[in-house]
Design a protein with these regions (language model features):
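Catalytic pocket-lining loop regions of alpha/beta-barrel enzymes
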Residues: 1-64
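Divalent metal-coordination and catalytic microenvironments
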Residues: 17, 29, 68, 105, ...
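Residues at secondary-structure transition points
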Residues: 20, 45-49, 78-85, 100
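Conserved short-loop catalytic and cofactor-binding motifs
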Residues: 39-42, 75-78, 93
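Ser/Thr-centric signal marking residues that sit
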Residues: 43, 67, 90
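A general structural signal for short secondary-structure boundary/capping elements
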Residues: 60-68, 108-115
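Short acidic/histidine-rich active-site segments
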Residues: 61-83
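Mid-to-C-terminal alpha-helical segments outside catalytic/metal-binding sites
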Residues: 85-119
Length: 119
C-alpha cells in the first residue's frame, strides 16, 4: 500500500484507518499526505505498543481518533460491541499518551477532519 501511495498520492489527502503498522512506516505514510487514525486498540494493555507509539509520534496536524465501531471496543469496554459512546476512552488514552488535555486533542482532531473534507 505504501508503494502505491508514494507512486500515486491522492490529491486531497487520505486516512489510514485504525493505524497499527508501527512507527517504522509512520513517517513514510505521513509523507504521502496521510492522516493517521488511532482506534480503541490503543487502550489495550497487550499487543498495542505499535499503536501507542504511533499515537505519540503522529504530528498533531496529521492525527485522527476513531471508534472502529462495532469492532475494537476500548478498555474498559473491550469484548463488547463497540459504539460511538465509547470514543471517550480512546480520546482519553491518546491525550494521556501525548501529555495533553482531552479537549485540546478533540479540537485538533476536529480541525484535521474538517481540513481533509473541506477541499
Amino acid at each position: 500500500m505504501l508503494k502505491v501511495l508514494q507512486q500515486i498520492p491522492p490529491e486531497n489527502g487520505h486516512i489510514l484507518h485504525c493505524y497499527s503498522a508501527g512507527s517504522q512506516f509512520l513517517d513514510d505514510f505521513i509523507q504521502t499526505g496521510a492522516l493517521i487514525s488511532i482506534a480503541g486498540n490503543v487502550t489495550f494493555k497487550n499487543n498495542s505498543s505499535n499503536v501507542k507509539e504511533a499515537a505519540t509520534r503522529v504530528p498533531a496536524s496529521r492525527l485522527l481518533v476513531e471508534t472502529d465501531s462495532p469492532y475494537l471496543a476500548p478498555a474498559p469496554k473491550r469484548g463488547r460491541i463497540n459504539t460511538p459512546n465509547f470514543i471517550v476512552y480512546t480520546y482519553t488514552e491518546v491525550a494521556r499518551l501525548r501529555g495533553i488535555d482531552v479537549e485540546d486533542l478533540a479540537e485538533q482532531v476536529r480541525k484535521n477532519f474538517s481540513g481533509l473534507f473541506s477541499n
